[in-house]
Design a protein with these regions (language model features):
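Bacterial lipoprotein signal-peptidase II cleavage site
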Residues: 21-27
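Alpha-helical cap/lid subdomain in secreted, periplasmic
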Residues: 93-205, 214-215, 219-225
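Conserved SGNH/GDSL esterase-like catalytic core that processes O-acyl groups on lipids
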Residues: 40-44, 49-124, 130
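N-terminal low-complexity, Pro/Thr/Ser-rich intrinsically disordered segments
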Residues: 27-41
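Conserved catalytic region of serine esterases and O-acyltransferases that act on ester linkages
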Residues: 22, 209-263
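C-terminal motif of bacterial Sec signal peptides marking the signal peptidase cleavage site
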Residues: 16-19
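Bacterial N-terminal signal peptides that target proteins for export
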Residues: 2-9
Length: 263
């Protein structure tokens, strides 16, 4: 009789534990499904500093790898300025009202050489974005050798100017240039530039994506994958970016350092 009672008791305990495990699994699945159903849209407006090495696609797949459903679109033209995009938007609408997040990338020389124009169009765009309850992010671009020579003769560098303009417009500054500066000082063996000493290398694009990921998601980029893939129009697998094994963790850590206090 006692043995029979023990068997019944063990059976009840087993069924209880099994049901608890299934409930937890179901809860986790439900949470993921809810997170995936709700998505937001992000528009990146700019030039080659935005589209080099598939930055928008890399960023979208970074979000997806963390179960953050943000779709990333771009309006980019090589060498373009924000004042040109302002005119393009007026004549060929960018549908900015459809986006929760909008990234503004002015020409790399404008913060130093044409700061009034840079300020004017950052303000125009930000006011327009605010009208539709969007959030503006200012792409804090880096200084390459030519710009470093110019900024050495001025009271502020590119990153400081763009940071100040962001604050004036209640926009969020994305410290990509600060991340570049940190790598150059502390990890000089990591190459951030193409052979023109201006445009970003694949390593630099990965770093840039990590900085954007942190600022937009509010989460640490440490622990993200080092490569991201998608599919082309024929449904075939393509890799958007593959970052070197020996440096991708360093780039994640740098992105964390420059964003942790401001994201």
């Amino acid at each position: 009789m006692e043995h029979r009672f023990n068997r019944i008791l063990y059976t009840i305990i087993f069924l209880f534990l099994f049901s608890c495990q299934n409930t937890k699994k179901a809860d986790r699945t439900d949470i993921k499904e809810v997170e995936k159903i709700t998505f937001k849209k992000m528009l990146m407006i700019g030039n080659s500093f935005t589209f080099y090495w598939n930055l928008p696609q890399v960023l979208e797949t970074m979000f997806d790898s963390s179960n953050i459903n943000i779709k990333v679109d771009q309006k980019t033209i090589g060498g373009s300025k924000l004042k040109e995009h302002w005119e393009y938007n007026k004549h060929k609408s960018y549908n900015i009202e459809d986006y929760e997040f909008v990234v503004l990338n002015d020409h790399s020389t404008y913060p130093l050489n044409n700061v009034d124009t840079c300020s004017k169009y950052l303000n125009l765009f930000t006011n327009y974005i605010n009208k539709y309850n969007g959030q503006t992010f200012v792409y804090g671009t880096w200084e390459y050798p030519y710009l470093k020579k110019i900024s050495s003769l001025k009271p502020s560098n590119t990153m400081q100017i763009l940071d100040s303009l962001s604050k004036l417009n209640n926009a969020k500054y994305v410290p990509v240039g600060n991340a570049f500066e940190y790598v150059e000082k502390n990890h000089p063996h990591i190459n951030l530039f193409m052979d023109d000493n201006k445009h970003p290398s694949p390593n630099a694009t990965y770093l840039t994506a990590c900085v954007f990921y942190s600022m937009i998601s509010g989460k640490s980029p440490v622990g993200l994958p080092r490569r991201f893939q998608g599919k082309n129009i024929d449904g075939k697998k393509i890799y958007y970016i593959i970052t070197e094994k020996n440096i991708y963790k360093t780039l994640q850590e740098v992105a964390e350092i420059v964003t942790i206090d401001i994201r």
